[in-house]
Amino acid sequence: MRLACAAVISPANAPMHVASFPSSSPSSVAATGTDDARLLHHRAVDDAHLRLAHAALDEIEARLRAPPATASAAGAAASGGGPKDPYLGEVHRDEGHVVYAHVGATAARFVLVMATEEEEDDDDASGAAGGTREETLRGMFRALSEAYADAVSDPFHAPGGKIASEAFARRVRALADAA
């Protein structure tokens, strides 16, 4: 799986930072190969990733508002940590992407949209390799949470506003490069 999009959503469900990492393969770009076509393609991909992250917010809200017993039963398989685990696991899936979520101590939502490989089947996603994937995702969320904490601790950051820090953007980009 490849990181396609990373988003930080405020407790009020406003996007604080959204970074999309479209595939750079030549087959994913319009056949004309012009810069305009490439730009339009990447903008459409960015919008698709944003829609996926937005669609996942309903499930995130449902899990956060669920009573502890229900949240534990519903999310135990995905998160493995019970109702107080900030890692929510898989919250949305479509034919080419899986969306994972984590909720920070400040109620900020961290969303990772992972592009699935066509040859990958569901057994690999939840089987023996699932533990490794789970650890990798938790590590990515930990790194994203640390970058977020550093960014919002900046005295020039407006509370609840968009994260404009270049250092934060670089750290998010490093997550995509490492995935």
Language model feature labels by segment:
Residues I9-S10:
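Short, acidic, Ser/Thr-enriched surface-loop or helix-capping motifs
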Residues R2-A4, V18-A179:
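Acidic, low-complexity cytosolic segments
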